[in-house]
């Protein structure tokens, strides 16, 4: 059989159930440009609808009847190299996504194409009308197309004609009255400005303009200006010389000057950053730095946990490591979990590395992200700093990845592909023979376990950099506050400490943990929280049916009004930041208060924090955004308004997250020369997690938590795969979820899976059962994250999609989901 030059293409229109590299012929005219890593337009499906794709490889294959050919090359050069293609293929196998979904995650949004379906007249209007006789609705379409100049976007046609547009369009296309083409347009275009320079040497330019200096002064001024300034933007030449654009064009025709285009990069502006002082490490920091640097120099894959108490100076160690990595001729990547932390960290790194640092995160304008990506790709950047998406920056010769606050759930993506940045970072370090550093005061239990098992190395920072003591912590019992007649949100101990700070001119941060607040029941007298008898997680309250439910195994029971332990009244816990702010203003009417949460800070995180620091505003109130990474020397008091809210949610990470949050927020106090204090308000002051956090005792917390994880088969002792079914009809979704559970149980009996002792739980409603009018039920597979399990779950997704009984429903899989 005849073979042909073909390409393997990842097609954007292919859903996960049929995703694979598709083979396409390469027309002779496109052979030179059809290389791996460029995007193409290809016909796909029975209707040969044009779809975007990315070439994965060039191959020689048999030319089969009906083979399709690529129609258009979209990129002048590859947007992904072989390493990027390999990463996309790895993500497909790991995170149950299509190859093209992985590609879109790797590339900056500015490089994405928007596809437009354009319908055009294929003949003269009068001929079209006579040919279209007998086609219902044809004349309305033709009228609209004529008004639009003979062609129109499908969206314009649908807006004007509604659902009635589809049938006449198809009929007229079949009758060759209309043509339909797909137009691909980049979301963001490159920006450039016009430059001007002398086209002849200076002496000749003066010789040609000097004689006519009086009659054509502008031409002489242009030559005089360019002779001094050299190549300059045309707008500046006109501004400084008064020459019009017409004058410049005339000079170009005369051969005096030449125009050219120069790329203009849209880079986020930073105010002038002073060069940073020499970094002086203390003995502990120096020891940690030298240990990790040895692994960078060894050029072998390694993972090190830099475990340091809050305020121990981990950032200074990061800076020194990056300095030495760059000295070795390698590049570095520094990740932070929250956008709010990026500007503060960027200023620190810019003070040492200047313009060789690029910042990447989702709050940047799309144009800025795209231009930063271009700088990185061209090798103009040695250090990339940003949130989890910065991992995909095309840095060459990578030597070091640092993940600050590695315990944060925001390192796990909630959108397809649902990747874990920690896993992707490890993949990159293995590929590049680079060192990975996880920095944290409260590492995840899985990371600490990997250290204990010898899989990771560990470097310790036990003391604060300035030798200050850790904050003194007071636990305020909210049950006692109620008994004392104070039902408010600010306890007496916290109010008294705030009064002291206001009198001393010192600042305070108040933290409100709102996660899960409206769905928790708690006894206001003894602190009892209903827990699932099987899973040891707090149950979620559903107001629609008045029941408590576990979202792992599906256990359900009626919600009681009174406490089964002491007979006290059960109460719903939680209040928003606005209500807290109102109470603070009543208590302290003269005090300045700043509020920072998701509702009030769209694009303004940095401005609020700068105001808090510059104007020394007495009180900053906020949610998760104020809990970590902030460093203000005049903050001496931190208040945690309700420690229980994150502790009693139905997630196996609840204790870990609460300990981490409390430790982090308490660590914001006393980072200057003054001793810090903290007040933790809670209904359960005897809880081990809260007591360990108050003492900043990670080791005690870890020992308790690892015992519970082993007992319940939670990570790191097993992996949890959440298999979620969603759809618009709740009954159908629940029946499909039950069917998925039974299929999973049958599949888990296979020998290659049974060895991991898998267990299938559920189905149970998702924590938020209805989103965008779609109901969600899920099963949980407790097992082993190995190749056999992932292949089985991939098969399950594909089989579910192919079953006509599941039409209109979706199934997706999460691994050790953050929520």
Where are each of the predicted segments found?
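Inter-lobe coupling/hinge segments of SF2-like helicase ATPases
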Residues: 272-282, 286-293, 299-734, 767, ...
């Amino acid at each position: 059989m005849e073979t042909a030059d073909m390409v393997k293409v990842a097609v954007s229109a292919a859903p996960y159930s049929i995703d694979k590299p598709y083979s396409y012929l390469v027309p002779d005219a496109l052979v030179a440009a059809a290389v791996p890593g460029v995007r193409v337009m290809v016909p796909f499906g029975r209707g040969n609808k044009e779809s975007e794709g990315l070439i994965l490889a060039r191959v020689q294959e048999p030319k089969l009847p009906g083979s399709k050919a690529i129609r258009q090359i979209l990129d002048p050069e590859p947007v992904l190299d072989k390493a990027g293609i390999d990463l996309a293929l790895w993500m497909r196998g790991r995170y149950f996504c299509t190859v093209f979904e992985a590609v879109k995650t790797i590339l900056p949004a500015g490089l994405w194409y928007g596809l437009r379906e354009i319908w055009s007249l294929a003949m003269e209007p009068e001929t079209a009308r006579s040919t279209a006789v007998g086609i219902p609705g044809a004349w309305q379409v033709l009228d609209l197309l004529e008004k639009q100049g003979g062609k129109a976007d499908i969206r314009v046609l649908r807006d004007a004609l509604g659902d009635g547009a589809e049938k006449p369009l198809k009929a007229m296309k079949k009758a060759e009255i209309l043509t339909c083409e797909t137009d691909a347009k980049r979301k963001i275009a490159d920006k450039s400005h016009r430059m001007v320079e002398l086209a002849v040497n200076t002496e000749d330019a003066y010789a040609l303009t000097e004689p006519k200096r009086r009659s054509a002064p502008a031409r002489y001024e242009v030559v005089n200006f360019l002779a001094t300034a050299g190549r300059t933007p045309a707008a500046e030449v006109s501004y400084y010389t008064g020459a019009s654009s017409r004058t410049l064009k005339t000079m170009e025709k005369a051969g005096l000057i030449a125009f050219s285009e120069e790329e203009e990069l849209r880079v986020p502006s930073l105010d002038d950053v002073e060069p940073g002082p020499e970094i002086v490490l203390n003995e502990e920091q120096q020891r940690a730095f030298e240990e990790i640097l040895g692994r960078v120099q060894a050029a072998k894959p390694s993972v090190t946990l830099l475990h340091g108490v809050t305020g121990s100076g981990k950032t200074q160690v990061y800076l020194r490591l990056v300095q030495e990595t760059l000295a070795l001729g390698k590049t570095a990547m520094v990740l932070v979990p929250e956008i709010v932390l990026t500007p503060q960290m960027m200023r620190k790194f810019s003070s040492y590395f200047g313009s060789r640092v690029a910042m990447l995160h989702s709050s940047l304008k799309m144009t800025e992200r795209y231009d930063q990506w271009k700088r990185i790709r061209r090798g103009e950047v040695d250090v990339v700093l940003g949130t989890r998406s910065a991992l995909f920056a095309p840095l060459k010769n990578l030597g070091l990845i640092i993940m600050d606050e590695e315990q944060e759930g925001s390192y796990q993506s909630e959108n397809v592909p649902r990747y874990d940045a920690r896993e992707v970072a490890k993949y990159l370090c293995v590929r590049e023979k680079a060192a990975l550093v996880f920095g944290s005061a409260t590492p995840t239990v899985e990371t600490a376990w990997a250290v204990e098992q010898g899989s990771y190395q560990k470097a310790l920072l036990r003391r604060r950099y300035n030798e200050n003591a850790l904050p003194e912590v007071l636990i305020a019992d909210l049950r006692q506050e109620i008994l004392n007649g104070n039902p408010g949100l600010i306890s007496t101990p916290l109010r008294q400490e705030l009064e002291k700070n206001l009198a001393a001119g010192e600042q305070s941060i108040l933290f409100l943990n709102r996660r899960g607040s409206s769905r928790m029941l708690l006894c206001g007298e003894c602190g009892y929280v209903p827990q699932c008898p099987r899973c040891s997680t707090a149950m979620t309250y559903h107001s629609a049916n008045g029941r408590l439910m576990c979202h792992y195994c599906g256990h359900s029971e009626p919600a009681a009004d009174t406490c089964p332990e002491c007979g006290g009244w059960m109460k719903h816990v939680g209040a928003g930041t606005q209500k807290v702010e109102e109470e603070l203003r009543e208590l302290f009417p003269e005090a300045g208060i700043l509020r920072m949460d998701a509702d009030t800070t769209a694009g303004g995180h940095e401005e609020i924090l700068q105001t808090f620091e510059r104007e020394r505003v007495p009180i900053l109130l906020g949610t998760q955004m104020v809990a970590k990474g902030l460093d203000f020397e005049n903050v001496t008091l931190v208040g945690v308004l309700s420690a229980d809210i994150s502790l009693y949610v139905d997630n196996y990470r609840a204790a870990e997250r609460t300990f981490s949050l409390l430790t982090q927020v308490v660590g914001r106090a006393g980072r200057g020369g003054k001793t810090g204090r903290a007040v933790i308000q809670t209904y359960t002051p005897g809880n081990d997690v809260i007591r360990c956090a108050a003492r900043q005792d990670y080791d005690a917390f870890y020992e308790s938590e690892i015992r519970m994880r082993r007992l319940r088969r939670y990570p790191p002792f097993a992996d949890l795969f959440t298999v979620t079914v969603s759809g618009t009809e709740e009954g159908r979704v629940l029946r499909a979820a039950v069917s998925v559970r039974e299929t999973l149980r049958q599949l888990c009996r296979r020998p290659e899976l049974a060895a991991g002792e898998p267990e299938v739980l559920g189905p149970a409603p998702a924590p938020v059962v209805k989103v965008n009018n779609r109901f969600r039920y899920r099963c949980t597979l407790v097992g082993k994250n190995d190749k056999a399990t992932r292949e089985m779950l991939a098969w399950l997704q594909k089989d579910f999609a192919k079953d006509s009984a599941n039409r209109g429903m979706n199934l997706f899989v999460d691994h050790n989901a953050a929520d």
